[in-house]
């Protein structure tokens, strides 16, 4: 499975692509950070992000996009910009019929470090080890994008099993309701 990990942001947007192997083996294929000027108009900054992300999707052909889920932090403007960047990325994926999954920061940290409260340095260190990189990915947005992709690769089998179980439960519920309806008639 090829996963594109995205750490959305208006000033810096981390992008990565990794390929999953057998078991928990993952291989980094590409990583970068899109930067937009803070003094540029919002719609132009989003366009820069959109154009770059679309190029990455067309070049790398990911099977799925893993995006960090935005949460309200102390700065509402930062959260808003991050959410807008994430929306542009999700839209680009939808146009290409690529599945999108959102993961919380604590989910990602727990997946790669074993600790949902790990700091940036711990995440970067573990990403470097897991992917057997020669150098630590910088800035932190690059490491976070790789961590998101790793998290999704490792969680994908569980996500698929949960979806299958939910589908089975929905089918069983539908059959049961049809049986009840027939019994009442």
From Swiss-Prot:
Belongs to the RuvC family. It catalyses: Endonucleolytic cleavage at a junction such as a reciprocal single-stranded crossover between two homologous DNA duplexes (Holliday junction). One of its GO terms (cellular component) is Holliday junction resolvase complex. Its EC number is 3.1.21.10. InterPro entries: RNaseH-like_sf, RNaseH_sf, X-over_junc_endoDNase_Mg_BS, X-over_junc_endoDNase_RuvC. This is Crossover junction endodeoxyribonuclease RuvC. Keywords: Cytoplasm, DNA damage, DNA recombination, DNA repair, DNA-binding, Endonuclease, Hydrolase, Magnesium, Metal-binding, Nuclease. Binds 2 Mg(2+) ion per subunit. Mg(2+) 1 binds at residues 7, 141. Mg(2+) 2 binds at residue 68. It is found in: Cytoplasm. It comes from the Bacteria. The active site is at 7, 68, 141. Its cofactor is Mg(2+). CDD domains: RuvC (cd16962). It holds the Pfam family RuvC. The RuvA-RuvB-RuvC complex processes Holliday junction (HJ) DNA during genetic recombination and DNA repair. Endonuclease that resolves HJ intermediates. Cleaves cruciform DNA by making single-stranded nicks across the HJ at symmetrical positions within the homologous arms, yielding a 5'-phosphate and a 3'-hydroxyl group; requires a central core of homology in the junction. The consensus cleavage sequence is 5'-(A/T)TT(C/G)-3'. Cleavage occurs on the 3'-side of the TT dinucleotide at the point of strand exchange. GO terms for biological process: DNA recombination; DNA repair. It comes from Mycobacterium sp. (strain KMS). SUPFAM superfamilies: Ribonuclease H-like (SSF53098). Homodimer which binds Holliday junction (HJ) DNA. The HJ becomes 2-fold symmetrical on binding to RuvC with unstacked arms; it has a different conformation from HJ DNA in complex with RuvA. In the full resolvosome a probable DNA-RuvA(4)-RuvB(12)-RuvC(2) complex forms which resolves the HJ. GO terms for molecular function: crossover junction DNA endonuclease activity; DNA binding; magnesium ion binding.
